[in-house]
Amino acid sequence: MLQLRDSVDSAGTSPTALLAAGEEVGPGSGGGGGGGGRPGVGTPLRQTLWPLSVHDPTRRARVKEYFVFRPGTIEQAVEEIRVVVRPVEDGDIQGVWLLTEVDHWNNEKERLVLITDQALLICKYDFISLQCQQVVRVALNAVDTISYGEFQFPPKSLNKREGFGIRIQWDKQSRPSFISRWNPWSTSVPYTTFIEHPMAGVDEKTASLCQLDGFKALLIQAVKKAQKESPLPGQEGGVLVLECPLLIETYVGLMSFINNEAKLGYSMTRGKIGF
């Protein structure tokens, strides 16, 4: 997480808002451990050449394929996306994370996520052209449920995922319709799901930026504070925090399989080209 304190003027009142790119929003590995000592008698010298801090050299090498981890890229991106914040409506920025959004069709998408005093901002950012292309704004006082747990799929699903995620749900009176659930391009689904970035923990400089636990802790704190200061009708009980399976209703999952295997939701090099 990056801690920021900055803001820019603008206006808006929708609990959830989708902004397209260009829309006006207002003015303006070293060694370590025992491997670092001198080799003992009869010990092959080459054993001391492997730094113990590198548990997965292949994964560490792959981090270079992601544009976001190139020197100065994440710093520039964070600096630029501050302009999407509406100080009157959103308040100050509390933190920024680099996470992976998993949509209702199990597609992975690289996202910059901001938590402000009053809003959750989900930014689609192109780390190649260094442009913010889209922003989804969710009012924190509209969040009714935050769930954390392992992913769950229908028994006969052909494309499942392992691991843990966090799901943020809002507008409990408007659960996804049948059409929204089965439309892979729907933007009206009233929840979002995040997992850690696939390269989380590889780059020590950005490790805290990708931590899901830190994001969850600050999100819960920010939602409770926003609901206490600006409660909505029907939210008297506060946000519901659950530890439970996160259901993704995909069966064949061919589209998400292709998307996730090829990492199409990430800005990264692909052979001699990058997209």
From Swiss-Prot:
Q: Residues annotated as region Important for homomultimer formation?
A: 189-275
Task: Provide the record's note on post-translational modification.
Answer: Phosphorylated. Phosphorylation promotes association with synaptic vesicle membranes.
Q: Where found in the cell? A: Cytoplasmic vesicle, Secretory vesicle, Synaptic vesicle membrane; Presynaptic active zone
Instruction: Spell out the InterPro entries in the cross-references.
Output: hSac2 (IPR034753), Inositol_phosphatase (IPR022158), TPRG1-like (IPR040242)
Record PTM Phosphoserine, positions in chain = 10, 14
Residues in hSac2 domain copies: 68-240
> Which residues does the record list as Phosphothreonine (modified residue)?
43
| UniProt function note | Presynaptic protein involved in the synaptic transmission tuning. Regulates synaptic release probability by decreasing the calcium sensitivity of release.
Can you name this protein? Answer: Tumor protein p63-regulated gene 1-like protein
Organism (species): Bos taurus (Bovine)
